Swiss-Prot record:
Active site positions: 146
Metabolic or biological pathway, per its Swiss-Prot or TrEMBL entry: Pyrimidine metabolism; dTTP biosynthesis
EC numbers on record: 2.1.1.45
Organism: Shigella dysenteriae serotype 1 (strain Sd197)
Record field: catalytic activity: dUMP + (6R)-5,10-methylene-5,6,7,8-tetrahydrofolate = 7,8-dihydrofolate + dTMP
Superkingdom, natural source: Bacteria
GO biological process, one term: dTTP biosynthetic process
Name of this chain's protein: Thymidylate synthase
Pfam short name (any one): Thymidylat_synt
Enzyme class: transferase
Binding site for (6R)-5,10-methylene-5,6,7,8-tetrahydrofolate: 51, 169, 263
Lineage: Bacteria, Pseudomonadati, Pseudomonadota, Gammaproteobacteria, Enterobacterales
Keywords: Cytoplasm, Methyltransferase, Nucleotide biosynthesis, Transferase
Length: 264
């Protein structure tokens, strides 16, 4: 995960001080790209411990089309608590847009099923895309999508994915985002009988919050360790049938976790 540490250092060296929606303040750069060859290991940050349970359950929750935090709470995941209303609802966030994007004529488009069908039947298409950025529903969402748009690409029997993330909390959020989409690529590849290729991450407003500086310097002082390996124990009938128990991370030996406040 050298690329991730290099990004942190770049934001420290080149970032512009900016105000933000949360009132916390950031150092920010605009436009950055990282590429992870998923054949070389699972891109889970090793310079601090990442909470893999939260990453897996959040992705399964997205794939369910769920937008209420009850499922997350049932599995001891609290990463969405700050944005939920008193009933646990978040409005039409990621899961809704991925699985039931509303059309003007009253239909709903299941984008995940659509891209799976494209990967199986038209893998050379340049339109294998999922968008969470539904302009017509942004004002109903508890939080506008940060990781907003992703595209799949098949070449030489390998599945790659590029994500555009319009806003990126480099210290807290980005390790989750990288691991989550890498996991999704592995799942999609298994469902389509493909090998994994690259995960390409592209960031817009890429920032470190002002109250994450000490934590960032601590993380940069640590030496990265070898990447772990992802093992998927079974192949379900559908992308929507995976369970938490289907995934195992082998050889994950991270440095200790680093606590930091969430900007809300």
């Amino acid at each position: 995960m050298k690329q991730y540490l290099e990004l942190m250092q770049k934001v420290l060296d080149e970032g512009t001080q900016k105000n933000d929606r949360t009132g916390t303040g950031t150092l920010s750069i605009f436009g950055h790209q990282m590429r992870f060859n998923l054949q070389e290991g699972f891109p889970l940050v090793t310079t601090k411990r990442c909470h893999l349970r939260s990453i897996i359950h959040e992705l399964l929750w997205f794939l369910q089309g769920n937008t209420n935090i009850a499922y997350l709470h049932e599995n001891n995941v609290t990463i969405w608590d700050e944005w939920a209303d008193e009933n646990g609802d978040l409005g039409p966030v990621y899961g809704k847009q991925w699985r039931a994007w509303p059309t003007p004529d009253g239909r709903h488009i299941d984008q995940i099923t659509t891209v799976l069908n494209q990967l199986k039947n038209d893998p050379d298409s340049r339109r294998i895309i999922v968008s969470a950025w539904n302009v017509g529903e942004l004002d109903k969402m508890a939080l506008a999508p940060c990781h907003a748009f992703f595209q799949f690409y098949v070449a030489d029997g390998k599945l790659s994915c590029q994500l555009y993330q319009r806003s990126c909390d480099v210290f807290l959020g980005l390790p989750f985002n990288i691991a989550s989409y890498a996991l999704l690529v592995h799942m999609m590849a298994q469902q389509c009988d493909l090998e994994v290729g690259d995960f390409v991450w592209t960031g817009g407003d890429t920032h470190l919050y002002s109250n994450h500086m000490d934590q960032t310097h601590l993380q940069l002082s640590r030496e990265p360790r070898p990447l772990p390996k992802l093992i998927i124990k079974r192949k379900p009938e559908s992308i929507f049938d995976y369970r938490f128990e289907d995934f195992e991370i082998e050889g994950y030996d991270p440095h200790p976790g680093i606590k930091a406040p969430v900007a809300i």
